[in-house]
Regions:
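Short, well-ordered alpha-helical
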Residues: 1-60, 65, 87-90, 320, ...
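A short helix-breaking turn/cap at a secondary-structure junction
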Residues: 16-20, 24, 149-222, 386-396
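Short helix-loop capping/hinge segments that flank enzyme active sites or metal/cofactor-binding pockets
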Residues: 31-51, 250-298, 302, 349-360
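Gly/Ser-rich, acidic/histidine-flanked active-site/gating loops
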Residues: 36, 45-48, 188-250, 278-281, ...
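Glycine-rich, small-residue loops and helix-cap segments
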Residues: 39, 73, 184, 190, ...
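Short, well-ordered beta-strand elements within core beta-sheets of diverse protein domains
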Residues: 55-59, 171-178, 278-282, 363-364
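Short glycine/serine-rich loop segments
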Residues: 69-187, 339, 344-350, 357-360
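Charged, often glycine-rich, active-site loop that binds/positions anionic groups
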Residues: 94, 98-99, 244-259
């Protein structure tokens, strides 16, 4: 029996869930006994399907998204809808229509985004598994900021049916959980999970990325390099990560501007309206350059992963920050690569910063070799032992 009264009380200071389904029940199967929260841009039959947008307030999903159908069939109880950044464009989750979501590790701090409710709910023990969506890092950044585990599948490995898309080419649905075992259980149910032959080659990281990282992130990542136990190769991309990420943002802004072209002006926040201007106002020459950069980067990252076992990077250049601060432009500099190259990636806890906020390690692997990716994550997880339960936690 799910104690929804306890869930409502524990959720109140966090605003991770926007709606609960008090009638939710699980069944038999691989996920029997587990509860799942679903980001508000993923359809759950009979539940609000807002995508964090005022323009969709009152919309109710007519049927489950394909991934939700798979989770139900595996026995999971789908218990409610999770807060998110408006239209999934941003990485802070201070939604102007549905409120700010708090990081369970520190009230007043962002859980990341755009799947901020997903990261917060899992970290606080409100659900066992949460579904998020990831356009350029929106599963992995909340996983890092909230100190949990997040999996971004290759876009071609998971259905988009029932997802309110941000950008069709970049978007995918992925799970978050408090352990790699739970994360893999969800991933095996909802994605085309590959048990291909063990990937060979050394680990690799990127040199001269141009990303301005917080000192604690640099120090913790150096610890990861030392713990790897083998030599880490270096690779370099032709463009700074900030330029690559911006090209992805322009692509997303163009798609979303077209999507919301007929939305009432008073139904979109001033911030979202501003973000939706960048793509349409881009000159033809600059847009051609953006597309070339995305294509070149996709091929380069795929080539690096084909040669090496996996790429390791920080998940984000910083830990969670106060809601009173502006979001750094570089939040998705590291995470955008897996979307641009259509590759699977995991974020796992790497340690904490000086403020005690979690930091994340990202591992990007090969499509069809997801089992290898999880095994590598387990090896690092055992060495780092960095998962920490927040004080704000609902124990079952």
């Amino acid at each position: 029996m799910i104690d929804f009264d306890a869930l409502v009380r524990a959720n109140a200071p966090l605003n991770a869930f926007t709606d609960f389904d008090g009638s939710a029940e699980g069944g038999g199967g691989a996920l029997a006994g587990l509860t799942v929260g679903v980001k508000a841009n993923i359809a759950v039959a009979g539940m609000p399907w807002t995508a964090g947008c005022e323009v969709y307030r009152g919309r109710v999903a007519p049927k489950d998204a394909a991934v939700v159908t798979k989770l139900r069939a595996a026995g999971a109880a789908i218990i409610g809808m999770l807060n998110m950044e408006e239209a999934a464009l941003g990485a802070k989750t201070d939604n102007p229509w549905f409120g700010k979501t708090q990081n369970p590790h520190k009230t007043g701090y962002t859980p990341g985004g755009s799947s901020g409710g997903s990261g917060s709910a899992v970290a606080a023990g409100l659900c066992d598994i949460a579904l998020g969506t990831d356009t350029m890092g929106s599963v992995r950044i909340p996983a890092a900021y909230c100190g949990v585990y997040g999996f971004k599948p290759a876009q071609t490995s998971v259905s988009q049916e029932g997802l309110e898309l941000a950008e069709e080419w970049l978007d995918c649905i992925g799970p978050l959980a408090r352990s790699l075992d739970l994360l893999e259980s969800a991933a095996r149910v909802m994605t085309d999970f590959g048990d291909g032959d063990t990937a060979s080659g050394s680990l690799v990281t990127l040199a001269e990325t141009g990303v301005d990282c917080e000192l604690e992130v640099i120090e913790k990542f150096r610890d990861v390099i030392r713990l790897a136990g083998s030599e880490i190769a270096l690779a370099q991309l032709a463009h700074p990560l900030s330029r690559i990420r911006f090209a992805g943002f322009i692509k997303t802004s163009k798609a979303m501007a077209a999507h919301f072209a007929d939305a009432g002006g008073d139904k979109l926040s001033a911030n979202l309206k501003k973000l939706l201007t960048y793509g349409p106002k881009r000159s033809d020459a600059d847009w051609a350059e953006d597309q070339a950069i995305l294509a070149e980067t996709a091929q380069a990252v795929q080539d690096i992963v084909a040669k090496h076992a996996a790429i390791i990077l920080p998940t984000a250049p910083q830990g969670a920050f106060s809601h009173s601060e502006d979001a750094p432009a570089n939040q998705a500099d590291y995470t955008c690569l897996a979307n641009i190259a259509n590759l699977p990636a995991i974020s796992l806890p790497m340690g904490v910063d000086d403020a005690g906020m979690p930091l994340g390690l990202q591992i990007v692997g090969r499509t069809g070799h997801e089992a290898d990716l999880f095994q590598l994550a387990r090896e690092f997880d055992a060495k780092l032992q960095a998962y920490r339960r927040p004080d704000h936690f609902l124990a079952k």
